[in-house]
């Protein structure tokens, strides 16, 4: 009973703070960026706006749920490859898009349809140039993704397309890997563990835990230029699967 009450209190406090911070933080961030945009180019204004979204996400995932939920981000990429990048991550929870705020880059995300329907957040995602791959033919998606990459904007994708119900790694869709082969930008696998129940699929209830995020080494075009999209997606999927197994093995040790 005591643990149940503690869990209820944690969730109540988190969601109250989440709503208050969103109602206050989003307008404040937007106003600051809008004011700065008067004196800078549209491109630099968009860069600041996208980074402001990341700062918002960092508060949501690191500050508000602490100390019940801890987020540990590790950059394991020693290649020093220049961006922009195509990030590909496994997908276990609705918290995954927020966790991508740990990446210290200007990014947009490839998302499903439902995030665009969220109040305020959906509008901000559209304004930032987030892409809904299910709402456009591949040619349009590829054109928009290529344009963003050419501007220096990294793209974050969840190629499983939907959250895993049991934590297992699903099959990958090939669209983003076709874009990679067309553009030649580096592909970086991202691995997330520990957030299966933060929150679990089908509920908004957050449970205490430690979330780990590993950014793996970049796969350069020279390494995959002879691949088909099918071969590339399977290679990336295997890299993610192997790292997740190692991460969870360490966690259980």
Task: List each language-model region with its residue ranges.
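Short gly/ser/thr-rich secondary-structure transition/capping motifs
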Residues: 66-74, 136-139, 195-197
